[in-house]
């Protein structure tokens, strides 16, 4: 069975991160974009990638407070509902610093910025910010510590069975190195990887594939 599978247009899936934090996953848009709502037991929620269908995202949020909308990278299939959701919720938008200018140009939204090594805190939720240069210059992943497993939101930088698309060999080398050193090296095999499209996977499932990815160059 695919891990945390959600069909496009279907109901959201609930994932227990720990006793205090839930994760809600929904697929929106025409290319199976994942949006993730990190929902603590108390305090404001965090939305990762306001990709599309602002009405469905707002229905998912309901009357809950959203304190931040974090965009994993600048591509428009991940920012299509950003302006509407920020307006609807009053949430603070965030993104990786190198992608901020491009996001503002396409959405009109000025994001506060984060980058590799930052610790993002909102209420009781803490996210390790991981810069992954390759799919875009400012792509980020977010590590949420859980029990029994950590959860990493990788945008379009890492998927089941492959890395994200890159525009050339230099970008691939950069992304491969960042993913190996910053995601796989410090992670346990039970760590769950939540990509920007499709099903989740685990570090343990993907770690044996790293030499293959390196050899084939994608």
Enumerate the language-model features and the residues they cover.
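Short beta-strand or tight-loop elements
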Residues: 19, 123-128, 138-140
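A generic "binding-loop/recognition-motif" signal
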Residues: 31, 52-53, 75, 99, ...
């Amino acid at each position: 069975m695919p891990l945390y599978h959600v069909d496009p247009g279907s109901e959201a899936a609930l994932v227990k991160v720990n006793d205090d934090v839930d994760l809600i996953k929904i697929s929106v848009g025409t290319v199976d974009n994942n949006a993730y709502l990190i929902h603590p037991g108390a305090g404001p929620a965090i939305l990762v990638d306001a990709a599309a269908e602002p009405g469905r995202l707002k229905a998912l949020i309901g009357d809950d407070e959203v304190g931040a909308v974090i965009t994993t990278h600048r591509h428009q299939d991940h920012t299509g509902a950003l302006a509407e959701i920020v307006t609807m919720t009053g949430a603070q938008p965030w993104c990786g610093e190198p992608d901020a200018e491009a996001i503002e140009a396409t959405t009109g939204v000025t994001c506060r910025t984060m980058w590799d090594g930052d610790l993002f805190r909102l209420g009781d939720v803490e996210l390790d910010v991981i810069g992954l240069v390759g799919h875009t210059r400012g792509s980020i992943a977010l590590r949420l510590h859980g029990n029994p497993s950590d959860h990493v939101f990788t945008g379009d930088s890492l998927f089941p069975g492959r890395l994200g698309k890159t525009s050339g060999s230099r970008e691939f080398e950069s992304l491969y190195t960042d993913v190996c050193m910053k995601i796989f090296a410090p992670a346990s095999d039970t760590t769950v990887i939540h990509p920007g499209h499709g099903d989740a996977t685990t570090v343990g499932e993907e770690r044996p594939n790293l030499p293959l990815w390196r050899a084939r160059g994608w």
